[in-house]
C-alpha cells in the first residue's frame, strides 16, 4: 500500500456541495487501496473575510491574534470534510497544525516550517483512518498558533508528504495543471505534462499562481513528486519532478508575468565604490525586496541606477531612496509604476544559444521597448510598459512555438 497526500484549495472546498465532491474523490482513492492524508485550505474568500473583520474591529491588529483568527478557516473545512467522510462510512479524523505538531518559527502570518513530527499522523494511519489536516497553520516553540502565509496549505501538504515518505503529493486546484502561459491571455496556451522543480520554482516566483514558491523549494529539497491537477475533472494534470534529459529538449517551457512591481531610478549617482551598498542597505533593513537592478555605463564619474520593488512597498522605498540620494549628492529620483515584467523559462536554455536574441527580436517586431533585462541559467525577464503586456505574452508564446504540440525543440545533440 502506498501513501498519497492530497491537498484541496479554497475553490475546491468553497461550499458544502464541493466538500462532498472532495470527499467522493478521496473515497475513490481510498477504495483503490491507498493510505491518504488530505490537507485542506479554508473555503474560498474565508481568510479575506476574517482579515476584514480583524481590521474592522482594530485598526492595526496584532499578528499573533490575526493568526489565531485566520487559522479557524482551515479548522472549519477539515472538520466538515472529516464529518462528510464519516457519513459515507469511512473512518476519518481531522487534525489541526498543533495536533500534527507542525513546528514553525515565531514569525506570525508568514511563519517558516522548521520540522514536522509524523508520530500522530502515523498512529492515525495505522488505525486505518483517513487523516484530514488543516493546512496553512503550525505552532511555535511557545505553543502559539502561527500561519504560513498565502498559499501555505501547499507547503503543509509537501511537508507532510516529505515526513511520511509519501509516493505522491497531489495538489488539487481550479485549473487543470501548469500551463505554458496564462490561458486567459493566450487561448493557445497548452497544459505542460511534466516540468522540473527548477522551472516550477522560476514560474512560481515569477507570477504563476498555481503553486506557492516555498512548497516547490521544499519538494525539491526532499524529492517529493507533485501532481498539480483539477478537482473538477478526472484529467491528468502536470507532474513536477526531478529534471530529466527529456526536458532539455524544450528550449522554453513557459512564459510568466508580474504586474505588481514598480521601478525607481536614481539619476546621476557618483560612481564610486560602496555606492550600491549605501543605496540597497537601507532598503534591506526596511525588509523591501529589490528584484531587478540595472546600472548605466558611467559618464564623467556619474551613473544612473534603476531597480524594481513591489508596488506595495513603493511609497516607503521612495522615502528611503530620496533620503539616500540626497546624502550621496545624486541629481534626484524618478519612479514608474506603469510597468510589467514578462519572463521566459526553460531548462533547455542552458544548452541552447540565441534564446535571448529571439525573445528581443519577437518583442521588437511588435514595437515593444525593453526597459530592463535580467537573466539566470533558465530564465530571461524583461520589464516593458504595462499596456504591452498581453501582446508581449502572445507574441513570445507564438515565437517559441508553445501553442503547438510539437514545441520547438533543441537539436538532439545539444
What are the language-model segments listed below?
Residues 1-216, 384-385, 400, 404, ...:
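Nucleotide/pyrophosphate-binding catalytic subdomain
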Residues 219:
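Acidic-aromatic/histidine active-site loop/patch
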Residues 32, 88, 222, 286, ...:
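Conserved dinucleotide-binding and phosphotransfer motif residues
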Residues 224-235, 259:
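Active-site C-terminal subdomain of aminotransferase-like
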Residues 43, 231, 295:
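Active-site beta-loop-alpha junctions enriched in small/polar residues
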Residues 168-172, 226-228, 291, 372:
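Short hydrophobic alpha-helical runs that function as membrane-insertion/retention elements
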Residues 57, 237-414:
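A conserved regulatory-domain signal marking ACT and ACT-like small-molecule sensing domains
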Amino acid at each position: 500500500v502506498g501513501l498519497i497526500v492530497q491537498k484541496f484549495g479554497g475553490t475546491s472546498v468553497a461550499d458544502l456541495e464541493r466538500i462532498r465532491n472532495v470527499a467522493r474523490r478521496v473515497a475513490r482513492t481510498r477504495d483503490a487501496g491507498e493510505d491518504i492524508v488530505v490537507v485542506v485550505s479554508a473555503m474560498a474568500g474565508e481568510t479575506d473575510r476574517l482579515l476584514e473583520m480583524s481590521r474592522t474591529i482594530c485598526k492595526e491588529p496584532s499578528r499573533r491574534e490575526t493568526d489565531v483568527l485566520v487559522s479557524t478557516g482551515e479548522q472549519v473545512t477539515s472538520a466538515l470534510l472529516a464529518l462528510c467522510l464519516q457519513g459515507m462510512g469511512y473512518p476519518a479524523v481531522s487534525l489541526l497544525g498543533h495536533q500534527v505538531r507542525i513546528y514553525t518559527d515565531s514569525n506570525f502570518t508568514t511563519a517558516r516550517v522548521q520540522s514536522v513530527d509524523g508520530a500522530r499522523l502515523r498512529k492515525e494511519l495505522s488505525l486505518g483512518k483517513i487523516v484530514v489536516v488543516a493546512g496553512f497553520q503550525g505552532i511555535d516553540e511557545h505553543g502559539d498558533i502561527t500561519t504560513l502565509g498565502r498559499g501555505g496549505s501547499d507547503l503543509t501538504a509537501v511537508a507532510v508528504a516529505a515526513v511520511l515518505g509519501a509516493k505522491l503529493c497531489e495538489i488539487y486546484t481550479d485549473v487543470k495543471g501548469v500551463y505554458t502561459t496564462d490561458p486567459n491571455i493566450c487561448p493557445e496556451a497548452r497544459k505542460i505534462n511534466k516540468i522540473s522543480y527548477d522551472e516550477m520554482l522560476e514560474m512560481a516566483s515569477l507570477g504563476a499562481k498555481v503553486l506557492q514558491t516555498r512548497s516547490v523549494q521544499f519538494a525539491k529539497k526532499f524529492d517529493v513528486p507533485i501532481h498539480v491537477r483539477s478537482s473538477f475533472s478526472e484529467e491528468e494534470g502536470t507532474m513536477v519532478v526531478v529534471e530529466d534529459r527529456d526536458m532539455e529538449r524544450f528550449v522554453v517551457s513557459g512564459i510568466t508575468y508580474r504586474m505588481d512591481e514598480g521601478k525607481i531610478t536614481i539619476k546621476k549617482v557618483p560612481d564610486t565604490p560602496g555606492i550600491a551598498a549605501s543605496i540597497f542597505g537601507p532598503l534591506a533593513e526596511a525588509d523591501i525586496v529589490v528584484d531587478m537592478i540595472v546600472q548605466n555605463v558611467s559618464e564623467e564619474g556619474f551613473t544612473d541606477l534603476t531597480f524594481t520593488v513591489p508596488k506595495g512597498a513603493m511609497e516607503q522605498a521612495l522615502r528611503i531612496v530620496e533620503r539616500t540620494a540626497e546624502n550621496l549628492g545624486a541629481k534626484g529620483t524618478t519612479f514608474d509604476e506603469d510597468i510589467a515584467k514578462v519572463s521566459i523559462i526553460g531548462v533547455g536554455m542552458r544548452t541552447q544559444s540565441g534564446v535571448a536574441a529571439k525573445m528581443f527580436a519577437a518583442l521588437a517586431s511588435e514595437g515593444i521597448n525593453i526597459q530592463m533585462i535580467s537573466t539566470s541559467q533558465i530564465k530571461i525577464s524583461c520589464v516593458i510598459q504595462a499596456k504591452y503586456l498581453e501582446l508581449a505574452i502572445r507574441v513570445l508564446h507564438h515565437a517559441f512555438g508553445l501553442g503547438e504540440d510539437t514545441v520547438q525543440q533543441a537539436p538532439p545533440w545539444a
